[in-house]
């Protein structure tokens, strides 16, 4: 079963706990720029991209606004050698920074990329939007070269029972999203064990799977950016604090 029935989970964080965490005093240890740089160095999605082999060809599936392309140049090490191809349901302005792109509705017609084979796949916050998450594993098995690696990220079960965004905002914690169903385009939450089985059926070995947590950096981000106009660092700290996202890294045999 790809979507498990609801069952007891680790206790999620409630409104009072989140508000107390958000408002507690903090003293930064880094300057603001360095805190952002370090966050985007240690985030598993970016570190995966940065450590790919020289001249790797990368499929960015569910590329959104195309911001993954920014990480070729920042932070260090620069990776202008990466050959990146974007896929989404519609074109974003940053898609022109890629070597190529394709747009379609995955549920009707996944991308073909003119028959290209890839050294790596990055798929972040996409499988919770499609009808059959296992179809990504099948696509990766067909389009990644032997030894090619896949990074897949999506919300964790801990996101399901968080307070709604509107409740946290009323309590003084402004966010873009809190609970999984704050985003009405989300379908049901794909189960990690089922995704691992789908990858194995399609010829992949699992390297690592887990929850994304960066506790020290979430404190740095809030020390600098809790009340900033740019809400992304605040949101990133919340995602880390709540264990909002999970990921898998797998290698095609």
For each feature predicted by the language model, list its residue ranges:
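Conserved N-terminal segment of class I S-adenosyl-L-methionine
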Residues: 1-116, 120-124, 137, 210-214, ...
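S-adenosyl-L-methionine-dependent methyltransferase catalytic module, highlighting the catalytic core
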Residues: 6-10, 14-17, 21-25, 131-140, ...
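Short conserved AdoMet
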Residues: 53, 131, 145
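Residue-level signal for threonine
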Residues: 92, 145, 158
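Short catalytic micro-motifs in class I SAM-dependent methyltransferases
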Residues: 125-129
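Short loop segments at secondary-structure junctions
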Residues: 252-253
